[in-house]
């Protein structure tokens, strides 16, 4: 088991932000169904990327890996051989997108994944695909992985629940490639910036669609062509380094590099949100300058940057006033129930924090070193690491191998910036630290 041992320390200097997971996975998928050769530069090399590559190879795409470059020759037929078993690993995007893609033309395709992936909702997507003609068979009565699916999709209309943007994003892929016209309406759409990211890819590849309010129509039979694409930095990952920079003792701004300020990624909102709370942040070409600065708490709508909930919760512990994070119901259905996970772990550190039905209430409070657990969630692990850097006393964070999902060199990046983090392999032990639990009832009455 990989564990981080974190000693209180401040960060200084500059950081190179890893490439976007969301763009990397979409680029690989579209290149794999395109006609001709595609070149993807600066891709994120991670377990989710490997899961997407393996699935696309099973579909018949030729994928060659070079240092920071993928060369892909697509299979525009987009047909999986009958009885293919797709392993989505621990990737929600691979699970949802490949399920939709396999339903377009293929038959008797089975998808499976990690035990953790089984808790991710699928019913809204599967029901929409049924409305387009797909069929599903489950190996158990629980409607969980693994399951077997068959297409093809027919011209039809469906609505789809909008609680998770990946449902609509997966449908957009399927409806673009299906033989005939298809349309769907998103009911109560959430996480809108991430669906907009999927639409951006359709526009980049000149794949037609039209929209009216929350209804999207696709003529079908679209044929994407090969393309070149340079993956920019991941704003979701940048948020963790930015948080460390805001809390830093540095007298100079900390530069976050490899970021495209014009990119459409959802968690870019994190930076303007922190500016609105008083943080000092500036933009300079492909860099963001974060000045160590104080900031207030506030009422924060999380819908546009749902993946930033764990690190924003940590920052709220250091704010000058209380905070209410709301409209984050979908955070319960990520790699962990992030609302409960971050509450449980930060309470171990002394945080005054209380979960609500769709978010969190946080009162500023000092944090103390503790023995913590990531809940096998990369964003929880990274958020706790930043909290531990600015806590009083050492901390241990167990189950941190999950960080490779989006930020493979997370510890190395922070240590270059003078953080004191040690990676070690151990089991839970009698190792002790100064732990305090300050429960929310004392502060929230």
UniProtKB/Swiss-Prot annotation:
Binding residue positions for phosphoenolpyruvate: 21, 92, 120, 166, 338, 379, 405
Gene3D superfamilies, per database record: Enolpyruvate transferase domain
Cytoplasm keyword on record: yes
Any Gene Ontology biological process: aromatic amino acid family biosynthetic process
This protein's name: 3-phosphoshikimate 1-carboxyvinyltransferase
Membership in a protein family: Belongs to the EPSP synthase family.
Entry-linked Pfam families: EPSP_synthase
Cellular location(s): Cytoplasm
EC number: 2.5.1.19
